[in-house]
């Protein structure tokens, strides 16, 4: 094993968040393809509970408080765990183009 592909982390967790579930699924597929290309074991993508934000607004500007409208935002989450990550895998993960609506968080 050479120094460029030496094991850097025994485990690397990637947490993905997005308000658009289709964008999130496309991004997880991209990451899975890239990781399988560099021979790193992967656990997931594991779907985490969706957070639901509900906002209630009164429709009328003056009277009639009973008339209300509700809006909701759903935050979708996925967790991926990479095992025995080498420097080549980290470099290939850095090159992935992530869409604007997706947030990535890395942790050990």
Curated annotation (Swiss-Prot):
Keywords, alphabetical: Ribonucleoprotein, Ribosomal protein
Domain of life the protein comes from: Bacteria
Recorded GO MF terms: structural constituent of ribosome; tRNA binding
Pfam family, one: Ribosomal_S10
PROSITE patterns: RIBOSOMAL_S10
Keyword NADP appears in the UniProt entry: no
GO biological process: translation
Quaternary assembly: Part of the 30S ribosomal subunit.
Family under the similarity heading: Belongs to the universal ribosomal protein uS10 family.
Function: Involved in the binding of tRNA to the ribosomes.
Entry-linked NCBIfam families: PRK00596.1, rpsJ_bact
Protein name: Small ribosomal subunit protein uS10
Species this chain originates from: Mycoplasma pneumoniae (strain ATCC 29342 / M129 / Subtype 1)
Record lineage: Bacteria, Bacillati, Mycoplasmatota, Mycoplasmoidales, Mycoplasmoidaceae
């Amino acid at each position: 094993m050479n120094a460029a592909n030496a094991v850097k982390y025994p485990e690397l967790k990637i947490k993905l968040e997005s308000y658009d579930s289709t964008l999130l699924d496309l991004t997880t597929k991209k990451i899975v393809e890239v990781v399988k290309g560099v021979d790193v074991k992967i656990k997931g993508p594991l779907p985490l509970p969706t957070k639901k934000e509900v906002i209630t607004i009164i429709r009328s500007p003056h009277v009639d408080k009973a008339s209300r409208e509700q809006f909701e935002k759903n935050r979708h989450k996925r967790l991926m765990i990479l095992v025995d990550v080498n420097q080549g895998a980290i470099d290939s993960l850095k090159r992935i183009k992530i869409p604007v609506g997706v947030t990535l968080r890395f942790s050990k």
